[in-house]
Regions:
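Periodic small-residue-enriched repeat registers in elongated scaffold domains
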Residues: 1-72, 76-85
Length: 88
């Protein structure tokens, strides 16, 4: 099983996992590196090795975890959307 990491200091530490962006937080699953972890995809938005962060993660059940807001009704340039509140 293969994994793929793209970007700056990104780590895909489990089977069939894809990470991209910059300085992601690694999947914390205790599974072997040859087995599936908690997430199939992780998008890192950290700024340094001591300031890792994930913008988004997608688990194997299709659940998506966001570290930010969702905007809807945006223009073609991804601006001017309506922000969805966290407490819906």
């Amino acid at each position: 099983m293969a994994s793929h990491a793209a970007g700056t200091v990104t780590i895909a530490n489990h089977a069939s996992q894809y990470t991209f962006g910059e300085y992601n937080v690694e999947d914390s699953s205790s599974a072997s590196a040859l087995a599936r972890g908690n997430y199939i995809e992780i998008v890192g938005n950290g700024t340094a090795s001591n300031a890792k962060s994930n913008a988004r993660a997608l688990d194997w059940n299709g659940n998506e975890y966001l570290n930010g807001y969702i905007y809807v009704g945006c223009g073609n340039d991804s601006t001017n959307g309506t922000r969805i509140p966290h407490d819906i």
